[in-house]
């Protein structure tokens, strides 16, 4: 009975939704991830925009009311 594995293909670590650079300037929060990734956005991004360079520099244009956890491994959280 692992019905949860049918919907989602196994994701690689790099495609999991995460955001190291997230900005919010309002209340309620409007957060937008400003991370730049090569050739694609994270798996939960609905609106992804990439440059036409090779490799493409892609950023997610979604505006949410939360930020994903940082992409870096935990332990680097103290640095601002």
Curated annotation (Swiss-Prot):
Keywords: Disulfide bond, Protease inhibitor, Serine protease inhibitor. It comes from Philenoptera violacea. Disulfide bonds join 18-71, 19-33, 22-67, 23-31, 41-48, 45-60, 50-58. Belongs to the Bowman-Birk serine protease inhibitor family. GO terms for cellular component: extracellular region. The record marks 25-26 as: Reactive bond for trypsin. Residues 1-10 have a biased composition (Acidic residues). Residues 1-29 are annotated as: Disordered. It comes from the Eukaryota. Pfam families: Bowman-Birk_leg (PF00228). Residues 15-29 have a biased composition (Low complexity). GO terms for molecular function: serine-type endopeptidase inhibitor activity. The record marks 52-53 as: Reactive bond for chymotrypsin. This is Bowman-Birk type proteinase inhibitor DE-4.
